[in-house]
Structures are given as structure tokens and as C-alpha cells.
């Protein structure tokens, strides 16, 4: 869940309503589980009314929130897994892929420099053209 400082008022309202709805489910389950002859006769209907009221308010509040949740995260949660674990695993995967791409870039830049030097040694008359090509194509080198 987002830190409270990063949440909009709509998100805070939705989070609060979801907590209330979850609490209403819990309260109803508790009443049913502990049902005795001494339980007030209106306890279950009142709890159901609260739950229904909370459930009815969710669509109105959720329409005001424009945050999209990736389907993968929803499936992860539906399987009873922690979305924080998903975020950590996703970050690690992105970092791993980034390192792989940076390694390939490093290798290509190294090959480019070595190839340019070989061309300059074999054909000294085109060394100025090779230097020009290297300088024009250079954005930001990662190879030292």
C-alpha cells in the first residue's frame, strides 16, 4: 500500500472504506460464530445492513480513483500472496535485465573501439573518417 503522504484524498477515502468493509465482514463473522440465545435479535440484521451499506459505497468511491493496478498484481493477491513480494521480485528482475543489457552495451562499445583501431591500423588513409564516424555516433560512452 502507498504511504499515507503519497495518497490522494480519494485514495485515502477508498482505503478507509475498504477497511470499514473488511471490519464489517469480520464483525458479521464474529456475531454468527458466537451466536447464542442471549445475542440480540437485531445483531445480525444490523451487521448485514452495515456491510451492505459499505459495499454499496465502494463503486462510487472507486470511480473517483484513477489508479490502475496491473492484472499480474491482482492475480498475485487473489492467490493469497503478498503484493510487496511481487514488487520486490519485479524490481529484482528489472535490475537483472538492466545489468544484462548494460553488459551487452559494454561489449558492443568495446568491440566498436577495437574494430575501429584495427581498421585504422590496416587502412591509415581512412583513420580520419573512422574517427569522424566514432564521434558522430557517440551519445554517452559507458566504456572507459
From Swiss-Prot:
Protein origin, superkingdom: Eukaryota
Location(s), subcellular: Cytoplasm; Nucleus; Nucleus envelope
Protein keywords: Activator, Cytoplasm, Nucleus, Transcription, Transcription regulation
Alphabetical list of Pfam families matching this protein: Med10
Gene Ontology biological process terms, A to Z: positive regulation of transcription initiation by RNA polymerase II
Keyword Lipid biosynthesis: no
InterPro entries according to UniProt: Mediator_Med10
Disulfide bonds: none
Coiled-coil parts of chain: none
One GO term describing the cellular component: nucleus
Keyword Translocase applies: no
Subunit (UniProt): Component of the Mediator complex.
Family: Belongs to the Mediator complex subunit 10 family.
Primary role: Component of the Mediator complex, a coactivator involved in the regulated transcription of nearly all RNA polymerase II-dependent genes. Mediator functions as a bridge to convey information from gene-specific regulatory proteins to the basal RNA polymerase II transcription machinery. Mediator is recruited to promoters by direct interactions with regulatory proteins and serves as a scaffold for the assembly of a functional preinitiation complex with RNA polymerase II and the general transcription factors.
Protein name: Mediator of RNA polymerase II transcription subunit 10
Species in which this protein is naturally found: Schizosaccharomyces pombe (strain 972 / ATCC 24843)
Amino acid at each position: 500500500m502507498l504511504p499515507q503522504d503519497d495518497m490522494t484524498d480519494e485514495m485515502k477515502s477508498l482505503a478507509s472504506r475498504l477497511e470499514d468493509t473488511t471490519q464489517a465482514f469480520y464483525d458479521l463473522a464474529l456475531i454468527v460464530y458466537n451466536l447464542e440465545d442471549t445475542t440480540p435479535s437485531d445483531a445480525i440484521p444490523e451487521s448485514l445492513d452495515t456491510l451492505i451499506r459499505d459495499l454499496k459505497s465502494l463503486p462510487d468511491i472507486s470511480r473517483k480513483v484513477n489508479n490502475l493496478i496491473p492484472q499480474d498484481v491482482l492475480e498475485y493477491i487473489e492467490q493469497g500472496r503478498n503484493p510487496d513480494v511481487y514488487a520486490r521480485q519485479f524490481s529484482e528482475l528489472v535490475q537483472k535485465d538492466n545489468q544484462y543489457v548494460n553488459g551487452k552495451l559494454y561489449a558492443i562499445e568495446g568491440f566498436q573501439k577495437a574494430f575501429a583501431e584495427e581498421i585504422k591500423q590496416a587502412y591509415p588513409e581512412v583513420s580520419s573518417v573512422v574517427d569522424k564516424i566514432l564521434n558522430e555516433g557517440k551519445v554517452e560512452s559507458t566504456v572507459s
